[in-house]
A protein has these predicted regions:
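Alpha-helical transmembrane segments and their helix-start/interface "positive-inside/aromatic belt" motifs
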Residues: 29-40, 161-171, 369-373, 449-457
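Cytoplasmic/organellar membrane-interface segments at the starts of transmembrane helices
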Residues: 369-372, 424-490
């Protein structure tokens, strides 16, 4: 019997949560050390799964399956393929770096880390779930703590509004996707929620065309798809730093991944039929998000709308149903997750020192926070899709897939590259270069060593994937084969 490594990854955060809650509230150091140890274990095991995956064999690996509610066809069924293994690693990395950056949090750290780790368990669970009921169960576990993390520890000006807005959008999306999932369960006649069994269910073309929008859009709301995206920037801005990192870095990928795994893979004919309007919606995401980001003066809103734009590329890559587009989207989920975690970490560090996010009021921060400035420049180069960084490895195949699908769409989407470069350069020049405003002289200091370690880990990954794409692309390609075989190698 193989070691249940995926279950250990999924439930390590919950185990840490229970341990953390045993500490008295005044024992903050023990809470932080326990949280960091649990996050490191989860990241280490996630990396083990990632590098141990047998690319030659492909398919689902590290599979565990146990009966849960057999009368209803519900089982605890988990496994990873070439698309989900990078996302498990992504979650582990963001979890670990988020704990490092939250080390100085003094407002109820015990409860903060408990809710953050419940969120992490939900995210891990969705990425490894091979049972629809389990996927929905973990999906809700991931969404629930977001409300509390934002409403309690978020930016006081908008935290209650943002938390409620986020919760309402995601709750409505969950209900819509639940309708589609239940329709598939009853229509299949198989009496099971097992996704591998449902891949072979003989759903009629008409049924797939009707149900696909429920499933896909229900999950894609969490992925920030237009026009259901405007909860996302507000949520980013109100959330504390580690939660923003999780929100943009991981949670939005959860929505896109579930839309692929459940919508596209279980209802392929429905996906094929609805491609035209999906491409248009995501094209709006890509171009509109970039233009809106370019006119923002709040540092965090720039990154928030940038995420909307980049997530549009992910879903657009899926919607092309081409090998290139799907590979690019798979890599982009990982690359964008690490990049936005880095961006929001930097924004949080600048805000902690300056107590403002208004770009016109900032400047010269690279003089006193050199590592922070360098980290943002690295993230900016990734965002612009520069060769040598992970963004290029992700975006180039997506645009190749778009060109194969429809050249004019690729050309319109390419406008976002120019706009992205313009606002990234604007932010770098105004926030990190120039002279340091007088009110900050003597009051702004460099970040801690733990912050630098977190930034270093994120930068190393972004550069590593860009310089040596073979560490990820062949793995993602094995997962893409699983998708394409459902479309007859489309």
């Amino acid at each position: 019997m193989q070691f249940p490594i995926l279950s250990v990854i999924v439930f390590t955060p919950i185990a840490a949560t229970m341990l953390i809650l045993l500490f008295p509230s005044e024992r903050k150091d023990e809470t932080r050390v326990t949280a960091l140890a649990a996050a490191f274990i989860a990241m280490f095991l996630s990396a083990w799964v990632y590098f141990s995956y047998d690319k030659a064999a492909g398919g689902y690996q590290f599979v565990e399956k146990y009966n849960w509610l057999p009368q209803l066809g519900i089982s605890y069924h988990v496994g990873v393929d070439g698309l989900s293994a990078p996302l498990v690693l992504l979650t582990g990395v963001v979890m670990f770096t988020g704990v490092l950056i939250s080390w100085g949090l003094d407002d109820r750290p015990r409860e903060f880390f408990a809710f953050l780790f419940i969120l992490a368990t939900g995210v891990f669970g969705v990425f490894v779930a091979l049972d629809l009921f389990g996927l929905l169960f973990f999906y809700e576990i991931a969404v629930f703590p977001m409300f509390l993390l934002i409403a309690i520890w978020g930016w006081k000006v908008t935290r209650e509004y943002a938390a409620m807005k986020l919760t309402l959008y995601l709750f409505i999306g969950s209900v819509i996707s639940l309708v589609g999932v239940l329709a598939m369960y009853f229509q299949s006649g198989l009496g099971t929620f097992d996704m591998l069994a449902l891949e072979n269910a003989n759903f009629s073309v008409e049924f797939q065309r009707i149900v696909f929008p429920f499933v896909f859009l229900g999950f894609a709301v969490l992925g920030g798809i237009f026009p259901f995206h405007n909860w996302s920037p507000d949520g980013h801005v109100a959330a504390p730093t580690a939660v923003s990192m999780f929100h943009a870095g991981v949670l939005m990928k959860l929505g896109a991944f579930a839309a692929l795994r459940v919508g596209i893979m279980l209802l392929p004919e429905g996906a094929r039929f609805h491609l035209p309007w999906l491409i248009i919606l995501t094209l709006v995401n890509v171009v509109y998000g970039a233009f809106i980001a370019s006119v923002q003066t709040d540092f965090k809103y720039v990154i928030g709308f940038s995420s909307v734009s980049h997530m549009g590329l992910v879903i657009m890559g899926f919607a092309t149903l081409t090998k290139e587009g799907l590979i690019g989207a798979g890599v982009q989920m990982f690359s964008h997750g690490i990049m936005t975690a880095l961006f929001f970490a930097v924004v949080g560090m600048v805000y902690d020192q300056a107590h403002t996010r208004e770009i016109p009021k900032l400047g010269g921060f690279i003089r006193v926070m050199p590592m922070v400035g360098i980290a943002f420049i690295v993230g900016g180069l990734v965002s612009m899709g520069m060769p040598g960084f992970s963004g290029f490895i992700a975006e180039f195949p997506i645009f190749m897939g778009l060109w194969r699908y429809q050249p004019w769409i690729a050309l319109v989407a390419a406008v976002s590259i120019v706009v992205t470069a313009s606002y990234i350069i604007r932010v770098i020049s105004r926030v990190f270069f120039g002279s340091l405003p007088e009110e900050f002289v003597g009051h702004v200091h460099d970040v801690t060593m733990l912050d630098k370690v977190a930034l270093g880990v994120l930068c190393f990954i972004l550069i590593g994937v860009g310089v040596y794409p073979a560490i990820m692309v062949p793995l993602v390609e094995t997962g893409v084969f699983n998708v394409l075989r459902l479309f007859g190698g489309a």
